Amino acid sequence: MTNETIYPLRGELEIPGDKSISHRAIMFGSLAKGITEVTHFLQGADCLSTISCFQKLGIKIENTQEKIIIYGKGLHGLSAPTDILDCGNSGTTTRLISGILSGQSFTSTLTGDASIQKRPMKRIMDPLRQMGADITSVHDNNCAPLMIKGSKLNGIHYHSPIASAQVKSSILLAGLYADGETRVTEPYISRNHSEIMLSHFGANVRTEGTTAILLPNPILEGQKIAVPGDISSAAYFIAAGLLVPGSEILLKNVGINPTRDGILRVAKEMDGNVELLNINTDNGEPTADILVKFSALHGITIGGEIIPTLIDEIPIIAIMAAFAKGTTIIKDAAELKVKESNRIQVMVDNLKAMGADIESTDDGMIIHGGKDLHGAIIDSHMDHRIAMSFAIASLLADGHITILDKNCVDISFPTFYQDLNRLAGNTLHF
């Protein structure tokens, strides 16, 4: 990427649909009776993997680009797949569908790409087995491929050692098929999209503190779901608007669920000019337009219960910190090591290559901001969030940045480079 002159980013942008909500709309619509229509669905590779898996499980799903139409067959309407279920690069697909498949009357095998086959699955295998699931790692390494033989399940009260929406959701979805109540208690509240949407479809689910509680065997009914813009995707443009002098960006209809809004809280704590307009609620999910203006940022300390609300945004927060004055400390984020890449090490290595003063810790990183950063070759490790973060860094770097495998952004944001270039007045060269 080359940006020989720093041009302000100005204009409006509709952010693609939320990835987490798009996944769940397909899954829950498939388990509901009747038709579910989904608008503003994220047409990214991960969510398309979820569609493919449920089609192989016997669900008719039409994708017209304008909307997704799911012809749900009810909680017990899935049929045995004749092929291996390929989850692609999607950890959400792999972990959530494992919970659903644990309660079926047939056997399934799940796999994914090279990244998925390295990501930890023991975190879902253990609680699902406690419920009675017959789930095995084919290579006996606690990773995919996974073989799941449908079993009779019992509700449990699981105390999760980590705040993970994927773990929680996998257990709750298995709980739909269990005898008795299912409870999941977390150290902090993780994303609650599953609880909100399951309730919207008709499930009996509630929250008490950091515990989600679900009763089994609901009758789920098809719904109309309007997916809000993904705040994790909006985060790159929030950062760009704050960092690039003269910028002013309006991001339309973005989800601001309080279990996901950590990036907004961090931006404001760093003295960022971020304003929420047109606050609304749709299908139980709060939304707003986000107005971002250039600001002089300063370093802060980020850790504790805010981490689950911004875990996917830490790469772009690290970019913000590198250009901010002072020191930023990110801690309690060891989960970054087992994402699509080891995001702690990858961010540190790539920012060092650009001349940043940054060091890794066991559970995060320390960034001494304000250094002039220069061009470099950036290894994305095929991680969409790494690629997008360094595309934003390139707007302010002195010299050319080459992002290896830059098209991995298609996982979550296929139009990312076009949208960024449009806001920059078509002055960027990729």
What is the predicted role of each segment?
Residues 1-430:
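Structural preference for solvent-exposed beta-strand-turn elements
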